[in-house]
């Protein structure tokens, strides 16, 4: 839907405050404006990951739950410094700990945790395995219990009245990972699928990965900014071709 949602004076003032154009920072995490209501989270706890925040007229959507309830709490503090609107929902963009570890905190403040059915099912069956995998490489990572999403979509979905669109293009870094697109700002969030470096391929479908990226490119989304899920966050559309070249160079078993 084009244009901002019409709102009263009070809502407009809150919305204006949300888009003041700066950044806020805590010890290990920062929140920086990308374009309009779209912000990037740089989370430097454990292994650096980048998430997203959308400041809507009636509330906030977080894309990626961050690593743990503690990192989620730190992010929420930064969100409250930008806007007084409540966090409405948090998207688990895949079933791994960096995208779903903060679920317990977000639920505790009344936010809905949103995912595709594929992500929810993988989380239910494989959460103990992925926590153990995380703790093997990061012994300080907590032994987090499973906290499942409570809003589940069978396929692609939209939030914020179409201003945020989540879609699946195929298996890649994980079997279930989704992209999130902000059409008004022409910003694409690449999740763990897109990044500067090759990264962890322990759960990746290396054969299918390039095909997934080709399907993404075939959509011909207008992209001014592509946000990588790890490493440095802000790139142009060339990040897609860059990562496709990296993954194609990986020997296949």
Q: Where are the regions that the model predicts?
A:
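Divalent metal-coordination and catalytic microenvironments
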Residues: 37, 54, 64, 79, ...
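Metallo-beta-lactamase
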Residues: 28, 32-34, 59-61, 67-69, 120-246, ...
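Bacterial N-terminal signal peptides that target proteins for export
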Residues: 1-12, 20
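Sec/Tat signal peptide C-region and signal peptidase I cleavage site
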Residues: 20-26
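Extracytoplasmic/secreted envelope proteins and their assembly/folding machinery
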Residues: 51, 72-76, 100-103, 210-213, ...
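Conserved beta-strand hairpin/beta-sheet module of binuclear metal-dependent hydrolase folds
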Residues: 32-77, 178-192
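Active-site metal-binding motif and surrounding structural segment of the metallo-beta-lactamase
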Residues: 57-59, 69-114, 219-222
């Amino acid at each position: 839907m084009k244009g901002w949602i019409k709102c009263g004076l009070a809502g407009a003032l809150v919305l204006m405050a949300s888009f003041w154009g700066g950044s806020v920072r805590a010890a290990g995490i920062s929140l920086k404006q990308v374009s309009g209501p779209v912000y990037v989270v740089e989370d430097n706890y454990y292994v650096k990951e980048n998430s997203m925040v959308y400041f809507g007229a009636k509330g906030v959507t977080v894309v990626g739950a961050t690593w743990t309830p503690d990192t989620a709490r730190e992010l929420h503090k930064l969100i409250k410094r930008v806007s007084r609107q409540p966090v409405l929902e948090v998207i688990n963009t895949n079933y791994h700990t960096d995208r779903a570890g903060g679920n317990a905190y977000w639920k505790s403040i009344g936010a809905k945790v949103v995912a595709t059915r594929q992500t929810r099912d993988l989380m239910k069956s494989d959460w103990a395995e992925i926590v153990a995998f995380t703790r093997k490489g990061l012994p300080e990572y907590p032994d987090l219990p499973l906290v499942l999403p409570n809003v589940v979509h069978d396929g692609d979905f939209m939030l914020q009245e179409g201003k945020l669109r989540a879609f699946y293009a195929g298996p890649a870094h994980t079997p279930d990972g989704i992209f999130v697109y902000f059409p008004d700002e022409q910003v694409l969030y690449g999740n763990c699928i897109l990044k500067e470096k090759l990264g962890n391929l322990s759960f990746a479908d290396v054969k299918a990965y390039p095909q997934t990226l080709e399907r993404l490119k075939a959509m011909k989304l207008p992209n001014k900014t592509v946000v990588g899920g790890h490493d440095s966050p802000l790139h142009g559309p060339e990040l897609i071709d860059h990562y496709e070249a990296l993954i194609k160079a990986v020997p296949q078993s």
